[in-house]
């Protein structure tokens, strides 16, 4: 998908983000993106009752988890929000104060900007699934500690296994480092496609909406990341199921 084919709704979303749309330089088209044929297709995208029951059971475990000290200071755990049929999974760092109160990830101003970012790639909040590395808010919004991440990551991995999304969009340095198991600077993680797990789910890294609110000049770079998101989704939608080759997508200039 190029800028010339953006819908009116997507242009409006970009205006809300404060991003000017320009014509992209010609580039080599994306190659095929397919699910790894060696990995059984999870039931999450079928919308089956079994998957819904499994997600409810997982949410119950999250809500009652006392594996780390964060359960003592939380108002509630924040499991995640979205549909089992989501082709896009958005992963952030941890709940903030608003999320801790409301029990839903990405609310407030950062959530509003995330909604506009989703609209820019042709998705509504209701069409995706949104989760965090940590399910409980760290006090004073401090960075997650390694022992907290260690206890929480199995929940996120279980969510990914249930959903089997076509694409994971990771927002922010901490989320990217913990999901991908790297310490590479965020700027070097952007502009290319990473892969998660044995099923090699494509992963695109971009800035956290809260950071973009503080640094609006970086929104143009975030738009480049969203173009890469659209490339991956477009390739997946046009070639899904045609072969079992490993997914590969061209890198984009960050």
Where are these regions (language model features)?
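A polyanion-binding, active-site-adjacent surface
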Residues: 2-254
């Amino acid at each position: 998908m190029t800028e010339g084919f953006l819908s009116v709704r997507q242009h409006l979303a970009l205006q809300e983000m404060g991003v000017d749309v320009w014509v992209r330089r010609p580039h080599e088209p994306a190659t095929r993106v397919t699910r790894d044929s060696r990995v059984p297709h999870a039931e999450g995208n079928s919308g089956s009752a079994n998957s819904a029951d499994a997600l409810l059971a997982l949410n119950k475990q999250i809500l009652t988890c006392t594996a780390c000290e964060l359960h003592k200071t939380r108002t509630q755990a924040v499991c995640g929000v979205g549909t089992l049929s989501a082709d896009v999974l958005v992963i952030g760092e941890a709940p903030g104060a608003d999320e801790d109160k409301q029990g839903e990830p990405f609310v407030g101003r950062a959530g509003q900007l995330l909604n506009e970012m989703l609209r820019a790639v042709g998705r509504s909040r209701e069409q995706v699934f949104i989760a965090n590395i940590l399910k409980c808010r760290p006090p004073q919004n401090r960075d997650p500690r390694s022992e907290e991440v260690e206890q929480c990551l199995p929940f996120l991995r279980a969510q990914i296994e249930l959903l089997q999304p076509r694409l994971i969009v990771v927002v922010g340095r901490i989320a990217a480092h913990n999901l991908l198991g790297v310490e590479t600077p965020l700027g070097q993680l952007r502009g290319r496609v990473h892969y998660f797990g044995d099923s090699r789910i494509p992963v695109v890294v971009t800035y956290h909406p809260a950071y973009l609110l503080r640094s609006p000049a970086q929104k143009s770079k975030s738009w480049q990341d969203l173009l890469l998101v659209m490339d991956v989704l477009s390739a997946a939608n046009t070639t899904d199921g045609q072969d079992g080759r490993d997914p590969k997508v061209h890198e984009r200039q960050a």
